[in-house]
Regions:
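N-terminal secretory signal peptides and thylakoid transit peptides that target proteins
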Residues: 2-18, 22
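Surface-exposed flexible segments
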Residues: 21-26, 119-123
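Bacterial Sec signal peptide processing site at the extreme N-terminus
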Residues: 23-43
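N-terminal segment of the mature soluble domain
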Residues: 45-114
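Short secondary-structure boundary motifs at beta->alpha junctions and helix caps
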Residues: 74, 149-189
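Surface-exposed short loop/turn segments
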Residues: 99-152
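Short, highly charged C-terminal tails/helix-capping segments
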Residues: 192-206
């Protein structure tokens, strides 16, 4: 645990969400908060590809979030873009060639949805589930710039978590962290399978 001061700008973006009440409170004082480790893939064997390089980008755009949901991408404990950048450079081994592997995040959706909680006297004796966090990512890998041809694969992964109303900011971030880890783990498995099946011209087997 590390004592850190949270950036108030993130809380302003989230104004009205369940996370906002915790983050705005943290703006006023130092709070013992967990520093979350990056999600990495160095323990997995890289996929060798005959490409000159790998480039990563988020082309998903701002996206439309309909009330009562809130966009929480700016308050996640780890960055989906940074995580996929780590994935691309740790899981794809560019051996050299004429093409480039473009790893594009085409969907990057993380929202908080408020849930109805019990009100009145009964609510004083219950600990209701107060928010649901929903995440979804779609990643597309394109091989471009190779005179021999082009190719692409795509995979999507989604997950959700619900949290009770008495959860602290650290507990809420733990739920978000676990959700992101689940999403990228599934993306890793699906993308590698798609690459081996449909980008075999560039994937070096062995």
């Amino acid at each position: 645990m590390t004592s850190v001061r949270f950036d108030r700008r993130n809380a302003l973006v989230l104004a009205g969400s369940g996370l906002a009440s915790f983050l705005l409170g943290a703006c006023q004082t130092s709070v013992d908060r967990t520093v979350w480790p990056d999600i990495t893939f160095g323990h997995r064997e890289a996929v060798a590809m005959s490409v000159a390089g790998v480039e990563v980008s988020d082309v998903s755009g701002p996206g439309a979030v309909q009330p009562p949901a809130y966009d929480i991408r700016n308050a996640l404990p780890v960055s989906p873009l940074a995580t996929m950048d780590a994935w691309a450079h740790q899981r794809i081994n560019a051996l050299g060639g004429y093409g480039t592997a473009l790893v594009k995040i085409t969907e990057n959706r993380f929202v908080e949805v408020p849930l109805e909680t019990e009100q009145g006297v009964g609510g004083l004796f219950t600990n209701s589930q107060s928010e649901r966090y929903e995440g979804a990512m779609t990643v597309r890998i394109e091989i471009v710039g190779d005179p021999a041809g082009q190719g692409f694969v795509e995979a999507r992964s989604a997950a959700s978590r619900t949290v009770p109303e008495d959860y602290s900011i650290n507990q809420r971030e733990q739920a978000l962290y676990d959700m992101i880890a689940t999403i990228v783990k599934n993306l890793d498995e699906r993308l590698v399978a798609e690459m081996r099946a449909n980008l075999s011209r560039w994937v070096m087997m062995g």
